[in-house]
């Protein structure tokens, strides 16, 4: 490894070319897409320990998009909160920055219960901790049992 220069000199022509795309990106990111009357909670220290309004919103949106009975979203895929006030496209990308897709599949009642037992008993403070929509359940971690 040989370091020829501490810094690569800027190329004014390249900067000019890239500025056009940067400006277009900035305009898209700053577009207002909504307004909130309260905070949508997605802070890692909260969403990986308990159900939140943002987790429910995302799970519900995915449930509706898939026309499913329930929606489940892993907390690790939610990366930020959205504060009260105007919401921009950038805010949306900050909370959900991955190129994930919504998956839909059919399960028997037993398969669903088996799946929920596995998901519900994942360690809190883990990205696997699930946010739910369309179901209500209680998890007894001491007994390692799920009640729906």
Briefly describe each language-model feature range.
Residues 1, 36-42, 91-98:
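Short acidic (Asp/Glu) and glycine-rich catalytic loops that position anionic groups and cofactors
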Residues 1-31, 121-131, 139-144:
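Active-site-adjacent helix-turn-beta-strand microarchitecture at beta-sheet edges
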Residues 2-3, 39-41, 73, 138-140:
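A structural detector for beta-sheet-dominated domains
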Residues 11-14, 18, 22, 29, ...:
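Generic structural signal for well-ordered, non-membrane alpha-helical segments
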Residues 29-47:
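A short, surface-exposed helix-loop junction/capping segment
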Residues 43-52, 100-103:
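Second-shell loop/turn segments in exported
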Residues 56-148:
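Feature captures C-terminal
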């Amino acid at each position: 490894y040989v370091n020829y220069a501490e810094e690569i000199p800027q190329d004014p022509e390249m900067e000019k070319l890239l500025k056009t795309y940067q400006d277009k990106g900035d305009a898209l990111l700053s577009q207002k897409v909504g307004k909130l009357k309260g905070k949508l909670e997605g802070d890692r220290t909260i969403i990986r320990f308990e159900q939140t309004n943002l987790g429910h919103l995302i799970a519900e949106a995915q449930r509706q998009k898939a026309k499913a009975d329930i929606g489940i979203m892993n907390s690790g895929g939610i990366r930020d909160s959205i504060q009260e006030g105007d919401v921009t496209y950038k805010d949306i990308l900050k909370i959900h920055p991955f190129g994930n897709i919504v998956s839909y599949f059919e399960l028997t009642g037993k398969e669903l219960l088996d799946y929920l037992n596995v998901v519900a008993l994942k360690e809190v403070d883990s990205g696997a901790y699930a946010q739910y929509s369309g179901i209500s359940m209680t998890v007894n971690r001491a007994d390692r049992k799920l009640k729906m």
